[in-house]
Amino acid sequence: MNFLRPHLRALVPAALRRRVRDGLESVRWRFPAPPRALPQYGLTTTQVYPQGTNFDLVMERALAGKLEGLRLSARTPVASIGTCFAEEFAQFMQAGGMNYVRTEPDALASSASWGRVYTIPNLLQIVRYSLEPDFPLVLERSAGGYFDPLRDHAPLPSASEAEARDAVRRHREASRKAFAECEIAVITVGQNEAWIDRTSGMVWGRMPPKEVLEPRRASFEVREFSLSENRAALEQALDALKRANPALRFLLTVSPVPSFASFSDSDVVSRSFANKCLLRALVDEAVAARSGHAFYFPSFEMVLCYNPTSFRADNRHVKYGSVDRIFGLLERTTGLARPRSSG
């Protein structure tokens, strides 16, 4: 048969051959061989990249050992805080009737009324105002009334400044209680761009509303946090929580949800994933430095690495269709585009 192959290749157009190859890879992806080890190198099945639908099976085997020290059961008091993907965890815990800590109502099912916590510096602010009685209480005023700018999806604005201050104090006590009552804190990091009040130095929980931003635009800046800024903020947040609750264990995750928009770059897709890589590296450092009480759950990898549309059956190499898309974009955005014949 081998002698026929060159003749068949000459008869079948290259584009068709590539499509057929991608189709065969999709079939192979659905019916992989069992997970393999490489004993000659001392590697187990969880150390060799999983092929096809073996992905979840191999991940399960790997995590069974890594998460053993977490000691998480349906009865373990758990709190969660973080980006929109943290909502999914909260809803999963509550739907299953598990011991999910909630110390006050929250529109997004969080353990306290934190809303979505997008950045690590914003997380640190929440930890600090929960544990430090003298942390500044900052209020802003919009058309609806007074509100807490440090939180996303905070309750409705209060009619008076006094009411708003009382509401923030109650929230901060509920926040402190949530961190104190849990045995495991699930922290999901996900974004790296925030609005900063230049006057107070506070990181806002979300973009300032139009009626606040427009007359004071010079008072605000959009900041993308550096590796060192994020590292320092994450270390301070985890260390402060551990001092306040010495038995506390951490389950850290990185949200797979990209940025909705970027004020820091004209290319939101590339900027978003550059920030994801930065956050993923920081979480890896934090877990390694806190062996025995900090653990990582790979929700980020489970979403982005499980991609039979783009990957071949080995879940590593890229299908021809995706290769064509990649280099088609390179041609269209550079001077590499092939000149078309005028005829």
Q: Residues of each region from the PLM?
A:
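Extracellular glycan-modifying ectodomains
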Residues: 2-343
